[in-house]
Curated annotation (Swiss-Prot):
Xref: CDD domains: Ribosomal_uS17
Pfam families the record matches: Ribosomal_S17 (PF00366)
Annotated organism of origin: Rhodococcus opacus (strain B4)
Domain of life: Bacteria
A GO MF label: structural constituent of ribosome
Name of this protein: Small ribosomal subunit protein uS17
Length: 93
């Protein structure tokens, strides 16, 4: 009696990757990053800057205020934290 093991190759969805600037690093293992989105006004056509702040997980505490960082979407780590730090692209001067 040979049983075939059903291997489910469940693919995870593509995760969003965003770039932004660190505006706060006062929490332990958490940074606040400001993400900028440029959208076109639906009626007038002008390009508008829209910003949003997200909390991201910084395991080693390497990012500081003013650093340009790359974030990746992840599972919910807390009530407000759904992003994690991938790398620091540019340190603040």
């Amino acid at each position: 009696m040979s049983e075939e093991k059903a291997v489910s190759t469940e693919e995870r969805g593509s995760r969003k990757v965003r770039t932004g600037y660190v505006v706060s690093d006062k929490m332990e293992k958490t940074i606040v990053v400001e993400l900028e989105d440029r959208v076109k006004h639906p009626l007038y056509g002008k390009i508008i800057r829209r910003t949003s702040k997200v909390k991201a997980h910084d395991e080693n505490g390497v990012a500081g205020i003013g650093d340009r960082v790359q974030l990746m979407e992840t599972r919910p780590l807390s009530a407000t934290k759904h992003w994690r730090l991938v790398e620091v692209l540019e340190k603040a001067k």
